[in-house]
Amino acid sequence: IQNIRSFDNLSKFLMGAIGSVVSPSNISKAMKQDKQDIHHNTVEKYIEYLVNSYVFYQVARFDIKGKQQLATQEKYYLVDIGFRNLKLGKFQYQDVGHILENIVYLELNRRGYQVWIGKIGEYEVDFIVKNALNKFEYYQVAWSMSDPKTAEREIHALKSIGDNYPKYIISTDIITSEMEGIEHKNIVDWLLEK
């Protein structure tokens, strides 16, 4: 690593962007706006170092309709969310949804599932997994479903999927339910299931 400062700033950028779709070129552009000139090839190399050293997991996108893995716009999740708190030195309430998404990813990974982030039309599905029985499952993660806009967005993405595999919404809501084949589960209950 030739530029330690750029590498450190890149790792902080990724930590602040957990649960967001990113690419080396848009990271490079964002860092250039912050007066840090770093080429997207260097960004790609530094990300590879962070993934290979088990600081981040890289999760590819999957086009649900076309049934194929996409080559760009991955998401990155931290192996330990404590790294984020240590490096960024702050906790911001608006990040809780992304932190919850990171926790759900870690649990899906722990369960041995193959995990992708999903895309169906203009909608994003937080996680598509292939379980031990080689069956698919779909997950949306939201801090709370109490906001009607959030509920509509999360439910509509899952309803857009035209198969009969299980579909879940994971949130911090205490009251959970099943609606139109979509099971809404509390994060703590879900974590303790298996």
State each model region's role.
Residues 1-135:
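Accessory nucleic acid-recognition modules appended to NTPase machines
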Residues 4, 152-156:
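Short amphipathic alpha-helical segment that frequently serves as the phosphate-/nucleotide-binding helix
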Residues 86, 148-149, 176-180:
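Switch/connector loops and helix/strand junctions flanking conserved nucleotide-binding motifs
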Residues 114, 166, 181-183:
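Conserved beta-strand segments of alpha/beta enzyme cores
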Residues 135-146, 154:
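Active-site ExK catalytic segment of metal-dependent nucleases
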Residues 159-162:
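Short, conserved loop/helix-junction motifs that constitute active-site signature segments
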Residues 164-171:
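Short, hydrophobic beta-strand segments that form beta-sheet elements in well-ordered domains
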Residues 173-194:
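Domain-level recognition of nuclease-like catalytic cores that cleave nucleotide substrates
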